[in-house]
């Protein structure tokens, strides 16, 4: 019976029976129908939000005291309530509303045209690069070039002029600078100095925090430190000699102001005439260091290069009378080095160079004059730890010039900008023949094709007729360099990555 308060009855009035809803087992309203009401087979119904009409209420016949008609009765009875009855829970209604909204949003998103929703393909963005050319000796000229149409060139890092390339600029004994802007192809450059049959040819290189240069006669040499940065650099120099590390007090903490060049005479610290290697480290800033040597029989300018486990020395000139390998071990453990020569008839191991052992922090020299026998070769040096190497060569007997063959790179794409013509040498250290196509672009745009095939483990030679930008593409990695046509100098070709150092960036046009 209901707990609802009842009114008083009249004398002739019969009490009225009030029906109550049975309590639900799982909430305020029943969601199931008894088997008798549902029939023999249960009907599967889709879930839907509760409507107030779904809640069972006594039909009008019930309220009149008559038996209810099953056809008009609700499936579930509504509990009787008074005026203070609470509101029903409307959670299912909100759930359905949110579901409908989600479907609508999904349909609207699908309706947006694909061209409006898809960001453009990522574009390759390349950063600019600056090369520094160490000061040479005498009247020197800077050759700068790239596959692109122009570069910024000059003798001061903060005062460069845009120049159509390839181009040759006189810089005398100043440092040179070559800069590409963002989006341009990487630059290459070299400095050539020729005077009375004595030639130096040095590549322009990027700044770094460390590097090494090897010299045959420190008593007639100096180091030139170039700081192209906008902040001061603090440089340490360590010399490695035949007996180990040389005491070089005063070569620590050398300060080089922004945009300045500082000359360090090596004879002050080492007046010996045996080969040494100078290790350069910059604690602050990035620098380029070159070494200059002079002697009655020649002169040379050398750019620093990093130590490496594999060192390639390309374009060893033919018909040299002297060939001395200078190798240094910058590590703290004994180092074993193997040498392979890549000659025109195939690879071979030079006599005495099959296994070279070097003490820690020391420099040695190995005579390879007879082993190379005056052949045009490329050398490959390998070790389990980083090493530093150069090949000192001297021309025919009676000549007065010499050269230090410096490290080159192994790559499918090689480039260099030449201030003069010469002999191109390409070496293949792989096990399969490599075909290559090359183009020499001269000032004014004239192009000369240079094509050929380099057998496995051998060296190919060909003429480069004039100054210009040389671009070589091989079917597999090659190493290469150009031997000067006058005097004796060797310029290594630079590896050019098939994609620039820039990162791929996706620009979304919808973002503002």
Regions flagged by a language model, labelled:
Residues 1-90:
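Terminal targeting segments of Actinobacterial cell-envelope proteins
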Residues 85-145, 188-226, 287-330, 387-432, ...:
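Conserved functional hotspot residues at active sites or interaction interfaces
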Residues 91-112, 278-280, 287, 337-339, ...:
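Hydrophobic alpha-helical membrane segments, chiefly transmembrane helices and signal peptide h-regions
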Residues 125, 130-131, 225-245, 282-283, ...:
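Short acidic, flexible loop segments centered on an aromatic residue
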Residues 145-209, 216-220, 224-226, 232-241, ...:
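Solvent-exposed, non-transmembrane segments of extracytoplasmic/periplasmic domains
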Residues 156-174, 245-273, 347-374, 443-469:
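Intrinsically disordered, low-complexity Pro/Gly/Ser/Thr-rich segments with frequent PxxP/GP/PP motifs
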Residues 174-184, 274-283, 376-384, 465-483:
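Short, aromatic- and glycine-rich surface loops/edge beta-strands on solvent-exposed regions
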Residues 252-343, 350, 354:
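Solenoidal tandem-repeat scaffolds enriched in leucines and small polar residues
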């Amino acid at each position: 019976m209901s707990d609802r308060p009842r009114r008083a009855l009249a004398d002739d009035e019969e009490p009225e029976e009030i029906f109550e809803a049975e309590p639900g087992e799982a909430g305020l309203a029943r969601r199931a129908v008894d088997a008798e009401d549902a029939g023999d087979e249960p009907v599967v119904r889709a879930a839907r939000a509760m409507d107030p009409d779904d809640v069972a209420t006594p039909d009008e016949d019930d309220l009149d005291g008559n038996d209810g008609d099953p056809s008009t009765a609700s499936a579930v009875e509504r509990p009787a309530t008074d005026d203070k009855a609470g509101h029903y829970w409307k959670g299912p209604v909100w759930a359905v509303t949110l579901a409908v909204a989600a479907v609508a949003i999904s349909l609207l998103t699908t309706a947006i045209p694909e061209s409006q929703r898809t960001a453009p393909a990522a574009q390759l963005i390349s950063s600019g690069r600056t090369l520094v050319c160490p000061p040479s000796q005498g009247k020197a000229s800077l050759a700068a070039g790239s596959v692109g149409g122009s570069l910024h060139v000059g003798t001061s890092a903060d005062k460069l002029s845009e120049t159509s390339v390839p181009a040759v600029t006189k810089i005398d004994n100043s440092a040179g600078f070559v800069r590409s802007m963002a989006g341009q192809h990487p630059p290459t450059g070299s400095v050539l100095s020729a005077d009375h049959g004595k030639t130096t040819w040095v590549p322009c290189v990027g700044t770094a925090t460390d590097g090494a240069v090897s010299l045959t006669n420190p008593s007639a040499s100096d180091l030139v430190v170039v700081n192209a940065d906008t902040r001061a650099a603090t440089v340490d120099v360590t010399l490695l000699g035949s007996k180990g590390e040389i005491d070089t007090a005063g070569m620590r903490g050398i300060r080089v102001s922004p945009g300045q060049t500082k000359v360090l005479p090596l004879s002050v610290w080492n007046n010996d005439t045996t080969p040494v290697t100078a290790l350069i480290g910059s604690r602050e800033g990035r620098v380029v260091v070159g070494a200059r040597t002079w002697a009655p029989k020649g002169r040379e300018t050398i750019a620093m290069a990093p130590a490496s486990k594999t060192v390639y020395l390309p374009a060893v000139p033919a018909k040299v009378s002297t060939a001395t390998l200078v190798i240094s071990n910058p590590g703290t453990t004994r180092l074993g080095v193997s040498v392979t020569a890549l000659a025109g008839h195939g690879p071979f191991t030079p006599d005495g160079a099959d296994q070279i052992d070097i003490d820690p922090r020391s420099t040695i020299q190995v005579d390879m004059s007879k082993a190379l026998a005056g052949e045009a070769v490329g050398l490959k040096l390998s070790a389990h730890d980083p090493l530093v190497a150069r090949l000192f060569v001297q021309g025919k007997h009676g000549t007065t010039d010499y050269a230090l063959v410096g490290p080159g790179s192994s790559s499918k794409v090689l480039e260099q900008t030449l201030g003069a013509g010469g002999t191109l040498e390409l070496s293949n250290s792989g096990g399969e023949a490599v075909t290559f196509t090359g183009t020499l672009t001269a000032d004014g745009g004239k192009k000369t094709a240079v094509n050929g095939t380099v057998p496995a483990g051998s060296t190919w030679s060909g003429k480069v007729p004039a100054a210009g930008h040389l671009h070589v593409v091989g079917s597999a990695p090659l190493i290469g360099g150009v031997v000067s046509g006058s005097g004796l100098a060797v310029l290594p070709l630079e590896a050019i990555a098939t994609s620039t150092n820039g990162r791929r960036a996706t620009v979304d046009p919808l973002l503002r």
